[in-house]
Amino acid sequence: MINKLAILGLMIIGISCESREEITRQQYVVEGMNLYQTNCANCHQVDGSGLKDLYPPLARTDLWQRVKMSELACIIKHGQKDSIQVNGKPYNAYMPANPKLQALDIAELMTYMREKWSPNKTIFSLDSARYALKNCP
């Protein structure tokens, strides 16, 4: 009984030592993974490798350094009709809009994708998502 209480106490201490932002980031990653699998993986693949010449990869690309995160948020929400270059290769397939995704969904999805494929592993905050979506072209 004492061992169980000690383990529970250590778990509570471990959890309480993480910052609120880190806990939120971890929650966003989990929710974002579910959103990615539902909304993005059919075209961009579960591993982010894309689909041959049709849909661009998200993993191992220059996209994360070259394109503003606010622009990617707008593309996710409103779709993309124009060609996009990834790793120097043009992709011309139409990306449909995701009108049902709200700012929180975009924040979670972007945080997950950053965690998986971007060198910048920080949270894409709800405020950042709201601002980006408010200012989409």
Where are the model-predicted features located?
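Sec-dependent signal peptide recognition
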Residues: 2-8
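Hydrophobic h-region of N-terminal signal peptides that target proteins for export
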Residues: 10-18
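Electrostatic cytochrome c docking/interface patches
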Residues: 17-35
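Cys/His-rich metal-chelating microdomains
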Residues: 20, 46-49
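The canonical Cys-X-X-Cys-His
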Residues: 32-46, 95, 109-113
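N-terminal, post-signal-peptide region of Sec/Tat-exported proteins
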Residues: 50-70
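Axial heme c-ligation environment in periplasmic c-type cytochrome domains
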Residues: 53-59, 81-134
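Solvent-exposed helix-loop boundary motif
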Residues: 72-81
